[in-house]
Amino acid sequence: MAFNFNWSPLTADAEFYQRAQEMLTAALNKSPKPPIIKDDILVNELNLGSVPPDLEILEIGDLAEDRFRGIFKMCYSGDAFLTLKTRVQANPLNNHLFSKPSFTSPQPLAADAGLTIPLQITLSEIKLSAFIIVVFSKQKGLTLVFRNDPLESLKVSSTFDSIPFIKDYLQKEIEQQLRTLMMDELPAIIHRLSLRLWCPEYRGKEDQEMAEAVKKTKDEVAIDPFASPPQDAVDARGNVLDASEISNLSLDGGSEIHSLFSQKNLLRLAALTNSHRTLSLFTPSIRDAVFRAWAPSERGDSAGTTTPATTSLHRPQSSLGGQSTTYTFSNRSSDDGHGSMPSRPSLVNMNSATTGLSLGANRGSRSHTTRKKKNRVVNLRKSKTTDNVSESGESETASITAASEPIVQSRIPEEPEDIPVTPPPGKVRFNSIDLGDSPKKLQPSRSITPEQGNMNQIPTLTVEPSTPIHSENQKRPAYNQSSFTSYTSEKSATTPPHTQFSYPHGLHFSATESPSGILEQAWIMKMASELARRRHDKTAREGFWSTSSNGDDAPPAYEPKAL
């Protein structure tokens, strides 16, 4: 199928060119411009040339007298060109120094002032190749859609062709902007131009809108900046102007009108400039002026100082289950010694049978946001030996449970705080411990469930200890004689009749069964039994704690007290 494509009416219509230039100018200034461009982009000249594009019909979807729809392959390599004019900033350093104080830049500085120069760009040798969808109707005009990027290449000629890197920069930027323009703005421009050519009603409406815009521009009243001049106006040389001289000035009066400032404000500005130059803290007050300053929080460059934080108590929940609660402490005071020494933490609440005691520094506490938090381990006992309680600052949370057995209702006395407890080497085995019944007056003050209150029997513990604990010059606190069992006849000669048993400090017993902690329970029960046997053995043999123990003797046998 063949058709006639007449290009000459477009090239001969002057009104068409004028309207096309206006639309292209509006489209080029719609998108954000680079900061180097300081003025609007004006389309100075537009010429479509004498060579029309080559069109190849690929598909025809609809064909009638007043409408047409088809897909074409377009190729263009003609003599069309486009000339643009604008003003650019030839001194990029001025943009950088615009927001900086004048006293921070070296004086004099040749590149301190702004320099804008005119720029003329000519786009020629445009080569296009694309698949287009054309829909034509006399009522709706011509609609053209590019299915791919049509721009293949073009030549950019500008005022800065003698500078290679500026030429390459302009070539790259203009190609990128032109691709966006052709895909987004060019179809809309072609559609409006087609409506103007084939739709008389659209042309009349557009002419009416343009006439109203011109009339509105003429009716605008210019604002006279000299209607309310300052009271003490001065000229460029600092001479005071009277009212008659001010009235003679006009908007077209020359360069002197730009020097009409208040004399007092000029003096204040000079004082402010001197303060900046000399780094003085004096700031003169100027009316109708706003002083901007950065607060330390906005600048982010000042790390505020805070007073030393005191020790705080935290209440973490136990990780072993239940609702057991312990109080731990964290020393967050600084190194200068202003922090206060915390008191020894004690067990406050026991809401379940599983209770943990933590003596380590709390790692959940947060210090100042700009300084690294300091966790310290505080030894609360006055050490009399060279042994240390712990180097890590964290004590193990002891929890002992016995399956299907009642809870031990006996009070656990604490050892004096000035006696450190250290584990010596050695390993001892023994069979069992019978603790007997605990008197009611020695029971701890805590809530007991009805199931625990109905049980009166004491569990028998069979353990294998691993690391016993020793202490010097420490007498074991005693319970009543009736609440504990005595040794058998083979040890009765060397055992005091009123020697009684107490649990080691820091161990707590419960009857709650935990399936995941059976191994831990067995180990702690072994350790408790070994500690009890060693303390009783050494007290009966030597009367004080010894630092050496071979642990070869078999443990004595225990038997329950006759009821």
Swiss-Prot record:
Q: Which residues form a coiled coil?
A: none
- Which residues does the annotated region (Disordered) include? 298-460, 535-563
| Compositional bias segments (type: Basic residues) | 365-383
Biological process (GO) annotations held by this record are:
mitochondrial genome maintenance; mitochondrion organization; mitochondrion-endoplasmic reticulum membrane tethering; phospholipid transport
Gene Ontology terms, cellular component aspect? ERMES complex
Specify the protein's topology with respect to the membrane.
Answer: Multi-pass membrane protein
- Looking at the record, the residues that make up the SMP-LTD domain are 1-195
Q: Give the main location.
A: mitochondrion
Keyword Mitochondrion found: yes
Location relative to the cell: Mitochondrion outer membrane
Q: Where is the composition biased (Polar residues)?
A: 303-332, 346-357, 386-402, 444-460
Q: Which GO terms label this protein's molecular function in UniProt?
A: lipid binding
Does Transport appear among the keywords?
A: yes
Q: Which UniProt keywords apply?
A: Lipid transport, Lipid-binding, Membrane, Mitochondrion, Mitochondrion outer membrane, Transmembrane, Transmembrane beta strand, Transport
Q: What does this protein do?
A: Component of the ERMES/MDM complex, which serves as a molecular tether to connect the endoplasmic reticulum (ER) and mitochondria. Components of this complex are involved in the control of mitochondrial shape and protein biogenesis, and function in nonvesicular lipid trafficking between the ER and mitochondria. Mdm34 is required for the interaction of the ER-resident membrane protein mmm1 and the outer mitochondrial membrane-resident beta-barrel protein mdm10.
Family of the protein in this entry: Belongs to the MDM34 family.
Swiss-Prot/TrEMBL domain comment? Lacks alpha-helical transmembrane segments, suggesting that it resides in the membrane via beta-sheet conformations similar to those predicted for other outer membrane proteins and porin.
Note the subunit structure: Component of the ER-mitochondria encounter structure (ERMES) or MDM complex, composed of mmm1, mdm10, mdm12 and mdm34.
What is the designated name of this protein?
Mitochondrial distribution and morphology protein 34
Give me the gene this protein comes from. mdm34
